[in-house]
Amino acid sequence: FRKCKILNAAIMKSSNDYLVFSDGDCIPDSNFLETHSRLAQKDYFLSGGHFPISERVSNLLTIKDIKSQICFTKKYLLKQGQPIGKNYFKLIKNQFLADVLDRLTPTRATFNGNNSSAWKSDIIKANGFDERMEYGGLDCELGYRLNNNGIKSLQVRNRTTVLHLYHTRPYKNKDAVKKNRLIRKSTIESKTTKTDFGIN
């Protein structure tokens, strides 16, 4: 599992000042990049939302469903067998209501690898992703360092969301998860602003 190393290489290869992050197991809505670009602010990173879809819905999903964006509708997901839950709020099309929900949600705005964005200069200042980390909370650890550097987080989970496809995680192991938890704890408690195990 070398996600952090790959992401750091991609960051250095990138030519834009503002970077948007997602994962290969996620389907962005049609306004994904536009929303991140429009809401970008100095001294902030954006924390988008994700909607985990079931194994059944993931298997039934087609390219046509994605291109038409029908897969981002409550009617479609319920018809395909997606369980009812609070995640459906993230599919609201009314941007005013989505903005209100983002302001009211008690959910902390963390840096999530499936849907986040930040200024490249801020990420480089924090020395990118910590390459000691494997699967399990590696993305939000970068967010903690950004916070420690004075970069605030903006909640946009209802204004832009991605569908998260179902899949197994054979790469997940308890030892790595425990190690990651300790690194995150250290980052928070010691107010670490830059990792020694990142880009440089």
What are these regions (language model features)?
Residues 124, 149, 156-173:
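Active-site donor/metal-binding and catalytic loop motifs
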Residues 66-108:
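Short, flexible, basic/aromatic active-site loop/helix in glycosyltransferases
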Residues 159-160, 173-199:
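Catalytic core of nucleotide-sugar-dependent glycosyltransferases
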Residues 110-127, 133-151, 157:
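A short, conserved alpha-helix in the catalytic core of glycosyltransferases
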Residues 23-27:
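The conserved acidic donor/metal-binding loop of glycosyltransferases
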